[in-house]
From Swiss-Prot:
Family that this chain belongs to: Belongs to the LEA type 3 family.
InterPro entries for the chain: LEA_3a
Stated induction or repression of this protein's expression: By salt, drought and heat stress.
The organism of origin for this protein: Citrus sinensis (Sweet orange)
Record's protein name: Late embryogenesis abundant protein Lea5
Source species, domain of life: Eukaryota
The entry's keywords: Stress response
Pfam families documented for this protein: LEA_3a
Amino acid sequence: MARSLFKAKLLLAPVADGISLSISRRGYAAAAPLGTISRTGIMEKNDLRPAVREDSGASSAWAPDPITGYYRPENRAVEIDPAELREMLLNHKVRAH
């Protein structure tokens, strides 16, 4: 009885492997066309975008700071001393009640 079960296991193992391989292959085959269709759709949308302007030259977003010499972003505002800022913002007028 044990020999017959062993032989049945040996005969059924390749069949089971073949079935599982065919199922997994079928799954990949069904998924592949959808992936290529969506990819081409993305590529077509990129072609419809307006072209990026190239005449801006070779400018960089970073420029040397005239005071320190270190590079900093070009669009950065000038730093104000905290004491000067406080002086500008505080209202020193005294109101009579």
